[in-house]
Amino acid sequence: AAHFHVDMSDESINTAMQKWNAFVNVIQTIGELRKKRYPPITGTEFHQLVMASLASPKDLILPYSLDFQKELEGRQGIQNCRARLMVVGGHLHDPEFIRMIESQGALVVADRFCTGTIPGFHPIEPIGGNPYKTMAEYTFARTLCPRMMEEFDRRLNTIVDTVKEYRVDGVVLEIIKFCDLWGVDSMPLVTALRERGIPVLKLEREYRLCAEGQLRTRVQAFIESMGK
């Protein structure tokens, strides 16, 4: 810490966690708007906000997030979407993937990525005054990655509950190529969701967005298969 001139004192870490919590409160408030019958925000916009938050210090991005929140309060809701979708899968850094899905008339109203908003964006609750223990508990207890094999039911229930809460019509399961963890997890996940009457589209993607025409065709066919 001294070599990089970084303050790693308990006070400094606690301050950083407070800044995180302030930002998370804004993200959660904006995310709640996606539950509306006519959300004022697209999935692409929300994903852009999330990606910016992962690359920027929270005290720098917070003012812009608050301004965006105020802007959304004055917006009219999106009424012309064909289907409300939830995107599930590994870490997704490219908002263009969401934009591609929404270009077919869908609206992405929820996500469940390994490091996405549902498992990752929660306030940090202090544990016994030890900030290091608090951060460790937050990191390992919140992240719902398939590498935690015993957590399958928890991941499944999180998705099912979100489908109900956000009035989702169908789930898009995106798997980055060669990610064995999601590759293995996807088979029982697709089966379990379909058994519960939830339509699922499984898409395998490259790290970079490519074969857009094929992806658009599959998304369009998925929406039509739901009668939308």
Q: Predicted segment positions?
A:
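Active-site proximal loops enriched in glycine and acidic residues that flank catalytic Cys/His/Asp
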Residues: G89, R112-F113, E174-K177, E204-Y207
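Peripheral docking tails and interdomain loops at the edges
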Residues: M187-K228
